[in-house]
Amino acid sequence: MKVTVSTAVSADGYLDDRSPDRLILSTPEDWAEVHRLRAACDAILVGAETIRRDNPSLLVGDEVLRRERIDRGLSPDPVKVTLTASCRLSPEANFFTRGDQEKIVFTSCSDPGPLRQGATRRRDHGCSDRYRT
C-alpha cells in the first residue's frame, strides 16, 4: 500500500494562521505537483475542517493528467474521502458538487441528517451515500 501526504507549511512550520481567510502557502509550481500527485492517487482524503474553511474541489486540474487517468481505465479524478465527527458539512460544498467521482464520508455521528440528504440528492453526479460509523 502506498500512502502520500501532501502538505504546504510556512517557513516557521505552520499549516495555517488564525484568520478566517484561507492562507495561501503554495506557489504555481507547488500546485502543478499537487495535481501530479492527485492524478497518481486512487483517493484523496481531507478533513472536514478543510472542506469548511477551504472548500476544495479536489479535482485533477491538468487536462493531460486527466486524459492519462482515463487512458489507464480510471475516472478523471480520484475518489474524494473525508472524516467528520460532527457531520457539519454543507451539501453544497465543492467536495460534493464538483466532479463526478465517488464521494465517501466517514463519520461517528449517529445522524448525518442533511449531509446524507445532500449526498443522496447528488447520487446522479457520482456522490455516494456511503457512510461509515
Describe the residue ranges of each PLM region:
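Active-site ligand-binding patch in enzyme domains
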Residues: 2-133
